[in-house]
Every structure is written in structure tokens, then in C-alpha cells.
Amino acid sequence: MITFNEFLRKVDETFASHQGKNKWRYGQTIMNVLWQTWPQKYKEIQGSDFDCFYDNSTVRLTLAKLEKEWYI
């Protein structure tokens, strides 16, 4: 598994690569990369106050939760 910092790097790289015609929101990118990296945590967060897929205003809360609970 990857570290939290590696996760953030992957989020940033993925976000940058999806800024063409079909732009992704940052929260959407976090959740997509989380699904690939830690599906169990994605399912736990999905639909909660920490789900930033559709709401970028929760990105900071989501990242703080993930950093606190990261398993490596």
C-alpha cells in the first residue's frame, strides 16, 4: 500500500491529467483515487459528511480524516 503523501501525489497527478475536455473536480479526483487505493475507506466515506465527490467544500475535512486514519 502507499503512504498518505504518495496518495496526495497521485491525486494531484490524476487531477492534472483530467483538466482537458472533461474536467474533474478536486473532490471527485480524491474519491476516485481513494476508490483505487483503499476501496473499504471509500465505501465508509461515501454518502457521509466526508464525501467530497460532489462537494469540493468538504475536501479539507476529507483529507484531514484520511490523514488521521491512514493505515501506513
Predicted regions, residues:
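C-terminal alpha-helical interaction appendages
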Residues: 1-72
